């Protein structure tokens, strides 16, 4: 039941930690010799790799991902393969060109930060946007990646903090407006990346911070609480 909670708290945080070091590197790198293997197989290869694989599933759709995997394994049984072989089958299954996705997620380093930009109209949202920041490392990075994620709205009910709803959206570029939230009652806690589909550091608005100070322990969803 709590497998993804443990993955986030242990494995994924390992990835975040090493991805913010000067030694960070892309997930997909050329392995020319054993020294390169020893250097590059770390929290990025394993934990970030698994996290980004989860984002790939969200990007292409679970059914398409499974269909692509079946064709990939059937076509390449007992053979050596390259990354492009898998991507070809996933593209065929989902009908999308994944070139740009592969380049930004697998061939560049660093972790983006996502933060909410909220404007209120009384007790309702006038607008809600997600601002994406480039990775601080490697120095000079300009990567703004596509993210398919959920934005969760949580309210205090009595002594509990409960999820009202969770909306799946696509984030791209520096600023993405979540039009579905305009006019809705403002949540006590707004959680970007609810359900933990993408790989990014998260920030919170002031109202959410105050709610977490008082009620985080009363949030019964362990994954949301860990995020």
Region locations from a protein language model:
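Hydrophobic alpha-helical and helix-loop surface patches within well-folded domains
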Residues: 1-140
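Long, ordered, helix-rich scaffold segments
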Residues: 13, 43, 123-129, 141-143, ...
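Alpha-helix initiation/capping motif
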Residues: 33, 82, 173, 205, ...
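Short, surface-exposed linear patches
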Residues: 50, 150-152, 212-215
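Short, exposed beta-strand "edge-strand" segments with a Pro/Gly-rich flavor and a Y/T-containing core
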Residues: 75-81, 91-93, 161-174, 197-204
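Beta-strand-rich binding/interaction modules
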Residues: 98-101, 111-193
